[in-house]
Amino acid sequence: MLIGASEIQRIRDYRPRVRPQESVIKAAVSIILRDGEHGTELLMMQRAKHEDDPWSGQMSFPGGKIERQDADSKATAVREAFEEVGAELTGDDFIGQLDDLYGLKINGVFSVHVACFVFKPQRELTLQPNYEVADMVWLPISVLDDRDNAFDYRHPKDPALSMPAVMIDQSKDQILWDLSLRMLANLHELLEWPMQVLTEAEQGVLKDMETRKVSRENIE
């Protein structure tokens, strides 16, 4: 699968749904694309394990909290991409923005509000991960075409909480789930591409994640 000129234009033309609501954390991420041997690839990182990081060990796109010095959420995404993986993104690399996403509600408040920005540099990036990154992978978007990669994931801190997920590399415990998977589901929907790795019912569960509520005791 290749995100070509027509798909890039569709992303450029899209007007994202931006919904400011109360959340514990406000963050922004960069979805960085490149053309690989077998189609479009996305840069993902596996976060280093750290007891103070709520996303410890998880697969994610480069990104992080919006800081006071950031001009806007896109500036946050660009800054975090450089700090975490050494990717120097410019204005020419920017394609567009996807819909804002929210994490689970914890005691009635969204855990995180994420702004999602898409970039496609026309050059090879020199990447240098920092201490926050355990591993990096250029993930072929075609992974989302293979139903065999799907499974039902149990939240590591609340086994009663299950959700659709996609296995990237079982030997490294690299799993695509929750917010990162929802971002790619939004990208597929924008491009009008079927995401064949998940059934329609599973995609419905994914869309409904924002409406699910958990207590803080269950996730701490």
Please place each PLM-identified region on the residue numbering:
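Acidic, glycine-rich loop-and-strand cores that form catalytic or ligand-binding grooves
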Residues: 126-144
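Amphipathic alpha-helical oligomerization/scaffold segments
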Residues: 149-152
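N-terminal leader/linker segments that precede catalytic domains of diphosphate-processing enzymes
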Residues: 1-61, 65-83, 87-97, 101-125, ...
